[in-house]
Amino acid sequence: MQPTRVLFKRSVWKGPHIVPLPIQRPEPGKKIAPIRTQARSATILPNFVGLKFQVHNGKDYIDLTVTEEMVGHKLGEFSATRKPFIWGKKK
């Protein structure tokens, strides 16, 4: 049996790093507010697919909607903490 992609980052006997988050599934036809979190190290689990998060980047909360391709990654991978450098014009 091959270890999954998630287990390459941590030892197999440790398992994935899971942070308990207040997850509520909305009833059909109802919307719930996005889950605000500073837990950038939380692993995205399959039951998070379709949920909306607001992940803290050190200054602001960045909106994030979880898709199937994100499963196994960390929440912090999808909210950049640094601004990209852009060459400015001289005044």
Curated annotation (Swiss-Prot):
The keyword Metal-binding does not apply. One of its GO terms (molecular function) is structural constituent of ribosome. PROSITE patterns: RIBOSOMAL_S19. Signal peptide: none annotated. Keywords: Mitochondrion, Ribonucleoprotein, Ribosomal protein. One of its GO terms (biological process) is ribosomal small subunit assembly. Coiled coil: none annotated. InterPro entries: Ribosomal_uS19, Ribosomal_uS19_CS, Ribosomal_uS19_SF. It is found in: Mitochondrion. Its main location: mitochondrion. It comes from the Eukaryota. GO terms for cellular component: mitochondrial small ribosomal subunit. It holds the Pfam family Ribosomal_S19. Component of the mitochondrial small ribosomal subunit (mt-SSU). Mature N.crassa 74S mitochondrial ribosomes consist of a small (37S) and a large (54S) subunit. The 37S small subunit contains a 16S ribosomal RNA (16S mt-rRNA) and 32 different proteins. The 54S large subunit contains a 23S rRNA (23S mt-rRNA) and 42 different proteins. Belongs to the universal ribosomal protein uS19 family. Component of the mitochondrial ribosome (mitoribosome), a dedicated translation machinery responsible for the synthesis of mitochondrial genome-encoded proteins, including at least some of the essential transmembrane subunits of the mitochondrial respiratory chain. The mitoribosomes are attached to the mitochondrial inner membrane and translation products are cotranslationally integrated into the membrane. PANTHER family: RIBOSOMAL PROTEIN S19P FAMILY MEMBER, SMALL RIBOSOMAL SUBUNIT PROTEIN US19M. This is Small ribosomal subunit protein uS19m. It comes from Neurospora crassa (strain ATCC 24698 / 74-OR23-1A / CBS 708.71 / DSM 1257 / FGSC 987).
